Amino acid sequence: MKTQKYLLLFILLVLLAACDTPEWGHFQSIPTSTATSTQAPTSVLAMATATVTSMQPFPTIDDLSSTIPAPTPTLASDAWKSMPIVPVVSARIIAVYQVGLAAGRDPNRFSKIGDCQNITTYFLASFDNPKQYRLGTKYAYLQPTIDHFSGSWSRQSLAVKGGENVAAAMDPIWADPKKCNAGETPIACEIRVNNPSIVTISMEESWSGDLVKYNEYLRMIVEYVLSQNVVPILATRAEVPGSKNSINEVVTRIAYDYQVPLWNFGVSALPLPSFGLTADGFHLSQAGNFFDDPNSMKEGWPWRNLTALEAIDAVYRAVSGQH
């Protein structure tokens, strides 16, 4: 009995530490067999979809390939620093959105996929409460998008959890057993339950610099989301320039290879004091989402929320023809 108590305490401490120490952790293995499949998947996309037991197949379009695109050697390692904060939307993504709508995706909903930097305590939820944000004159044009996605901003995503890394997001062990089907991954569960047309993907941790696995699993997530005819928006993070544990190069490369929207938050944080980070070099500095207040706009969180809103607005306007 004592052994069980100690084991539970250890597991709890590990989960709590996962988002406090960005260098901690390792990738969990994705099961190669489930209750409905006993054969190991033969491709990255197969690995991503093997655990889904309830999602009906959606129509596909010709340019959605299950093969990972070959990296393009012309993209510089620091290319993200010169890319726009607000994404440019490709024709491919417009096609994904249109096919998704034809398949029944909800144009009024978006979902979030990510770790502790995506919890409703700090991220986007204030846009569902007019008393908790202020756009000011400069950003007043964003209000129609806030209204359009009402309810999605403060919704608790089934694919967001402190300590959830890119591997865990595709692992059924991390799914909510009360709301998700047996063998369903957190991402598959969130897409089934919320039926979004757009998702933000913001995975902040990189586990002692294991960027090879980070790249592998993030590509898997992007491929799965595209296979469900949902538009993914990939996010860069605030980073200290010269950091050897940078994920922004990987994120940018994947967005480039798949022609998916890049929400380049990392660039908006570069001019901020301490690059928008607290003393630990990972968590963002805090202030309210009052975008007409110069003091608020010296901190990391207002910029993360503002640029996320700008990215969602830009993608929604492009895919819906509201240029």
Predicted feature residues:
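Active-site segments of SGNH/GDSL-like serine hydrolases
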Residues: 200, 204-206, 219, 223-251
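Conserved SGNH/GDSL esterase-like catalytic core that processes O-acyl groups on lipids
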Residues: 104-213
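Loop/turn elements at helix/coil->beta-strand transitions in domains of secreted/extracellular proteins
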Residues: 106-109, 194-199, 226-233, 258-261
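Bacterial N-terminal signal peptides that target proteins for export
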Residues: 1-7
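Extracytoplasmic/secreted cell-surface and envelope-processing proteins
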Residues: 120-122, 208-216, 235, 241-247, ...
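Ser/Thr-rich, Proline-interspersed low-complexity disordered segments
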Residues: 19-88
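Catalytic His-Asp segment of secreted/periplasmic serine-dependent ester chemistry enzymes
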Residues: 241-323
